[in-house]
Amino acid sequence: MSRYRGPRVRIIRRLGTLPGLTNKSAPQLKPSSINQSTSNKKISQYRIRLEEKQKLRFHYGITERQLLNYVRIARKAKGSTGEILLQLLEMRLDNIIFRLGMTPTIPGARQLVNHRHILVNGYIVDIPSYRCKPQDFITIKNKQKYESIISKNIELYQKSKIANHLTYSSLEKKGLVNQILDRESIGLKINELLVVEYYSRQA
């Protein structure tokens, strides 16, 4: 299944707010509409797991195959499969750029990476799925061209605090990965255990 490129509002209307996909909030449904929709059909456990899986896929902007591969990697690692899955997704380069506040969405971050504008530890990295590590530092190749845009994004984003595992220096225009993030620093409302359960027969 390919990466979704359709209307983003349609997705958040169905799944709720997904900050990585769009900075728009999910539309509020009228109570009568909610009662009517829930009374018309009983929500199955499969659908609940499916929707949690879709939240991860659309928020991080990855394909079905990519998400399944991340689940398989998480299953082989020691520790909580769900928590490791979230760590793998959060440490992607495109997500780190987004969480630093350098772009308003993950698709915007992915575009910067694909166009070879991002340096990791001083070297160009053009792979959005590149897995960042503690002490990696992220900078923009053409600072003069993007300085005003990045600064504006940072100013808007820092109204909501940057996660503890990251640091951004406005003076040096440089982001730093301090450590692997903990569960509380995830920027998405998600039940990762339901995602693991969804893939239980495939991973």
From Swiss-Prot:
One annotated GO biological process: translation
One Pfam family of this chain: S4
Highest taxon of the lineage: Eukaryota
Main subcellular location of this protein, as a coarse class: plastid
InterPro entries membership: Ribosomal_uS4, Ribosomal_uS4_bac-type, Ribosomal_uS4_CS, Ribosomal_uS4_N, S4_RNA-bd, S4_RNA-bd_sf
GO CC annotations, alphabetized: chloroplast; small ribosomal subunit
Record's subunit section: Part of the 30S ribosomal subunit. Contacts protein S5. The interaction surface between S4 and S5 is involved in control of translational fidelity.
Protein name in the entry: Small ribosomal subunit protein uS4c
